[in-house]
UniProtKB/Swiss-Prot annotation:
Predominant localisation class: nucleus
GO molecular function list: 2-oxoglutarate-dependent dioxygenase activity; demethylase activity; DNA N6-methyladenine demethylase activity; metal ion binding
UniProt keywords, alphabetically: Dioxygenase, Iron, Metal-binding, Nucleus, Oxidoreductase
Enzyme category, top tier: oxidoreductase
Residues annotated as binding Fe cation: H184, D186, H239
Function statement: Dioxygenase that specifically demethylates DNA methylated on the 6th position of adenine (N(6)-methyladenosine) DNA. N(6)-methyladenosine (m6A) DNA is involved in epigenetic transgenerational inheritance. Plays an essential role in DNA replication and repair in the germline during meiosis. Binds to components of the DNA replication machinery such as top-2, and directs their localization to DNA to control DNA replication.
Protein name listed in UniProt: DNA N6-methyl adenine demethylase
Assigned protein family: Belongs to the alkB family.
Cofactor binding, note field: Binds 1 Fe(2+) ion per subunit.
Species of origin: Caenorhabditis elegans
Gene from which the chain derives: nmad-1
C-alpha cells in the first residue's frame, strides 16, 4: 500500500484527494452521474417547502446553491413539494456556544475515516451485517451533549424533544482533502427516526435524492445550523455531502437515536437497549468548566 493510502482511511470504492492518484483508485470503474436527469429542487427553509428550479443541476456549485436558496424565497410555489420530517434551524448555536464546543472537540484525538474525513465517535461498535453491538469502548457522551439536547427541546419539543442519543459522531470535512460522504440511507436496524446534523466552522449542502421519483433536492445548511431528517426524509430519500460543496474546514456534529426495537418495550431492549441508554446518559468531561 502506498504512502498516500496510509495517510487516509479510504478503501473499496471510496477515495479522497490523498489517494485519488493511487493504483487502487485508478482501477475503479468511473460511475456515471445517476442524477443528471433528475428534477432539481431547492429547499426554502422559510416556507418549509422544496421549490423546483431550472437554475441548478446535479453538478451545481455551493455558491450557486446558496444564491438559489435565497432567491427561491420570493418565487411561486407552483410545483413545490413538502418533504415530511425535514427540519432546518438557522443559527441554532450562538457564536460563543460554537466556540466552547469546538474548544472541547479539538482536545479529543481524531481517527481517520473514509472519503477524506476524520471522526470522533461516541457510541457502540455496531456490526450491521451480523446485527451485533459491542459497548466495551462506549464510555458515554461528551459533556456538551446536554446543552445541545436542551436547546433542541426548547426550540421544538414535539419535533426535537426527548432525544436519547445512541451515538454522537463528529465528522471533519476538509476542502483540500476533497472530503465527502456518498449518497446513502442510515442503517434502520439500530438507528431510529430522527437524524441530527449540526454545522460547525462552515456551512455546506445536504443533497437529498428520491430515486423512486427521480427528484434531487439541495438543502443549504448555513454555519451553526441544525438539520433534522426524520419520517419521509429519513426513509424515502437518500442523503449525502458532496466534495465540491465543502469550503475550508467543516465539522458535522451528528446524532442518532435508537430504533423502536432498542427502546423500552422493544424486542432488543433487554439485550442491548437498556445498557446503551445507560451509557448514553453518562457524560465524558472534556473541560474544567461546563458549557
Amino acid at each position: 500500500m502506498g504512502s498516500a493510502e496510509q495517510a487516509c482511511g479510504c478503501k473499496g470504492a471510496r477515495f479522497c484527494a490523498l489517494c485519488e492518484t493511487t493504483e487502487r483508485v485508478k482501477k475503479l470503474r468511473v460511475v456515471e452521474d445517476k442524477h443528471v436527469n433528475y428534477k432539481v429542487f431547492i429547499y426554502d427553509h422559510i416556507r418549509q417547502i422544496a421549490i423546483p428550479t431550472t437554475n441548478l443541476n446535479s453538478q451545481s456549485s455551493l455558491e450557486d446553491i446558496i444564491d438559489e436558496s435565497t432567491s427561491c424565497q420570493s418565487v411561486s410555489t407552483d410545483g413545490s413539494i413538502e418533504i415530511d420530517g425535514l427540519t432546518l434551524i438557522h443559527n441554532f448555536l450562538s457564536e460563543s456556544e460554537e466556540s466552547k464546543i469546538l474548544n472541547m472537540i479539538d482536545t479529543v484525538e481524531w481517527a481517520q475515516s473514509q472519503s477524506g474525513r476524520r471522526k470522533q465517535d461516541y457510541g457502540p461498535k455496531v456490526n450491521f451485517k451480523h446485527k451485533k453491538v459491542k459497548t466495551d469502548t462506549f464510555v458515554g457522551m461528551p459533556e456538551y451533549a446536554d446543552m445541545l439536547l436542551n436547546k433542541m427541546s426548547e426550540y421544538d419539543v414535539k419535533k426535537l424533544g426527548n432525544y436519547q442519543p445512541f451515538e454522537m459522531c463528529n465528522l471533519e470535512y476538509e476542502e483540500v482533502k476533497k472530503s465527502a460522504i456518498e449518497m446513502h440511507q442510515d442503517d434502520m436496524w439500530i438507528w431510529g427516526n430522527r437524524l441530527i446534523s449540526i454545522n460547525l466552522i462552515n456551512g455546506s449542502v445536504m443533497t437529498l435524492s428520491n430515486d423512486n421519483k427521480s427528484f434531487l433536492c439541495y438543502v443549504h445548511m448555513p454555519h451553526r445550523s441544525l438539520l433534522c431528517m426524520a419520517d419521509e426524509c429519513r426513509y424515502d430519500w437518500k442523503h449525502g455531502v458532496l466534495a465540491h460543496h465543502i469550503r475550508g474546514r467543516r465539522i458535522a456534529l451528528t446524532m442518532r437515536e435508537a430504533a423502536k426495537d432498542f427502546a423500552e418495550g422493544g424486542e432488543l431492549y433487554e439485550k442491548y437497549g437498556a445498557e446503551l441508554i445507560r451509557l448514553g446518559n453518562i457524560r465524558v468531561p472534556l473541560s474544567k468548566t461546563s458549557v
